[in-house]
Swiss-Prot record:
Keywords for this protein: Amino-acid biosynthesis, Aromatic amino acid biosynthesis, Lyase, Magnesium, Metal-binding, Plasmid, Tryptophan biosynthesis
Pathway noted in the entry: Amino-acid biosynthesis; L-tryptophan biosynthesis; L-tryptophan from chorismate: step 1/5
Protein name, UniProt field: Anthranilate synthase component 1
Organism listed in the record: Buchnera aphidicola subsp. Tetraneura caerulescens
Residues that bind L-tryptophan: 40, 304-306
Cofactor(s) of this protein: Mg(2+)
Catalytic activity, EC: 4.1.3.27
Length: 526
């Protein structure tokens, strides 16, 4: 298919390295929306690996059911919005409306759920909006990744592709997906202690190009100033806040209600409805300082995936241990990392890890038949998901049941990978694999239908956050161990996988243990 090409000029500026990108976020983006910080760290050494910070967004792409809204955030983005050729979409039974001078709305046809599984991947869908924008931008050959899109894919997006009832119990209209196309992106390589600013220029207006160059200089100087005044650039971190008013409120699913739900799910399993299902609890608490809470969470619970997304309507932050979907455009290798099997860490009376008791916890998890059966079931589910999109014979389980330990819990982790078919892209892959079995259950579709029948909207929880690039790479994590903040109130959601052998008290405690790292981080800033 032909896409009219829009040339992207990329300027890379070497900036002064800083070991703590959240300080730069605080300095440059504290009051800016449509900003995003993505980070990764080693679990045991607590060492930063890489950070990527969208300082300025060119365009924002949001999806609400079958409507995709493309909004130009900058003049540079407005040029891109007015240049993208959307005629291809008009041929696919879509309607395009100009909502404002800087906002386009694309109305997609209702998806036909009951088509053949392979044909379903090629039906017109809301992913075509992301696909066309990505393919319309010509990336410089010398650029390693090309343009950069960062954002979220909500759990409830699945209702646009599968016969899963939509839940409407929230007064807020949360997007099914929301991505920012970066205009100014800071990239930190913490191993090499290097930092560079990547600027994307789409406009051909010389005056606007000069404005962008001025913006580069401002950002460069702001970063330099932070580094020259490290001692005086501390954020009001957790130590500066009173912690007397610690409180968290359980919404709807208190312990008694949750245990009853576990019993109900076990009966459905016994009736043959599902083999396993993930039901969750929501905890609400005040969160007036989400950035400070994120910093505390990052310090005490370093994870492979950490994120702080600041939208005009919400803030989402977290430290997730679990990859959602990862794809390399060079090798075409696609990966899923199922996590199932959880035990709390063992602490001594002085709140330090008791190594002897911790090892006993690990052994108990490794030999627990319920945990092993649940994990194998989800590894098999990941294999099935990849079999639909990978080349025959390329799918393998490269890691099986490794133990990974975090601040409050330990998990069993596996890795399933394969080679993506040549006729498919990252959007086909995500469409086929969402939502991950570790947050839904098995069989996946029926499990999600039952979760929807519970009448509790999940929004971000159980969805994915991460990025994709102009060159076609994708790296996302599952949104867990996170807080979704609106109007100063955080919602922390955590779930447990229910099987026939589940014990209600243990599953209830597992939810609390999983939520505790985030709740503690927020409480430290109250």
């Amino acid at each position: 298919m032909y896409y009219r090409s829009i040339k992207s000029e990329i300027i890379q500026t070497i900036c002064t390295y800083h070991e703590e990108p959240s300080l730069i976020f605080n300095k440059i983006c504290r009051t800016k929306t449509e900003t995003l910080l993505l980070e990764s760290a080693t679990v045991h050494g607590k060492k930063n690996i890489e950070s990527m910070l969208i300082i300025d967004t060119a365009i924002k792409i949001s999806c609400f059911k079958n409507i995709v809204e493309i909004e130009a955030i900058s003049n540079n983005g407005l040029f891109l919005l007015n240049t993208i050729d959307l005629k291809i979409l008009k041929k696919k039974s879509t309607k395009i409306k100009k909502k404002k001078s800087n906002v386009l709305e694309i109305h997609f046809p209702i998806f036909n759920y009951f088509t053949d599984e392979d044909k379903k991947l090629f039906l017109t869908s809301v992913f075509d909006a992301l696909r066309i924008i990505k393919k319309s931008i010509k990336n410089p050959e010398k650029s390693k990744m090309g343009v950069f899109f960062g954002g979220i894919l909500s759990y409830d997006l699945i209702s646009s592709f599968e016969p899963i009832p939509r839940v409407f119990n929230s007064k807020y209209n949360h997007p099914d997906f929301c991505f920012y196309l970066s205009e100014n992106l800071l990239i930190f390589d913490h191993k090499k202690k290097k930092c560079k600013l990547q600027t994307n220029i789409f406009t051909d207006n010389e005056e606007e190009k000069l404005n962008i160059l001025k913006r580069i200089k401002i950002i460069y100087n702001q970063i330099k100033e932070i580094n020259s005044k490290k001692k005086n650039n501390r954020i009001n971190t957790f130590n500066d806040f009173k912690t007397k008013n610690k409180k968290w409120v359980d919404c709807k699913n208190d312990s008694k209600v949750y245990k009853n739900k576990v019993k109900k799910m076990k009966q459905m399993i016994l009736n043959g409805e599902v083999f396993q299902i993930v039901i969750s609890r929501k905890f609400f608490l005040p969160c007036p300082y989400p950035l400070e809470s994120y910093i505390f969470l990052k310090k005490n619970n370093p994870s492979p995936y950490m994120f702080f997304m600041q939208d005009r309507h919400f803030v989402l932050f977290g430290a997730s241990p679990e990859s959602s979907l990862k794809f390399s455009s060079i090798t075409r290798k696609i990966e899923i990392h199922p996590i199932a099997g959880t035990r709390p860490r063992a602490f001594s009376s002085i709140k330090k890890i008791d190594i002897n008791e911790d090892n006993k916890m690990e052994l108990a998890m490794r030999i627990n038949s319920k945990e092993l059966a649940e994990h194998c079931m989800l590894v098999d589910l990941a294999r099935n998901d990849l079999s639909r999109i990978c080349l025959p014979g390329s799918r393998v389980v490269s890691d099986l049941m490794k133990v990974v330990k975090y601040s409050h819990v330990m998990h069993l982790v596996s890795k399933v990978e394969g080679v993506l078919r040549n006729d498919l892209d990252i959007f086909h892959a995500y469409q086929c694999c969402m939502n991950m079995g570790t947050l839904t259950g098995a069989p996946k579709i029926r499990a999600m239908q039952i979760i929807a029948e519970e009448g509790e909207i999940r929004e971000c929880y159980g969805g994915a956050i991460g990025y994709f690039t102009g060159k076609g790479d994708l790296d996302t994590c599952i949104v867990i161990r996170s807080a979704y903040v609106r109007n100063g109130i955080a919602c922390v959601q955590a779930g447990a996988g229910i099987v026939l052998d589940s014990i209600a008290d243990e599953e209830n405690e597992e939810c609390k243990n999983k939520a505790m790292a985030v709740i503690n981080a927020i409480n430290k800033t109250l």
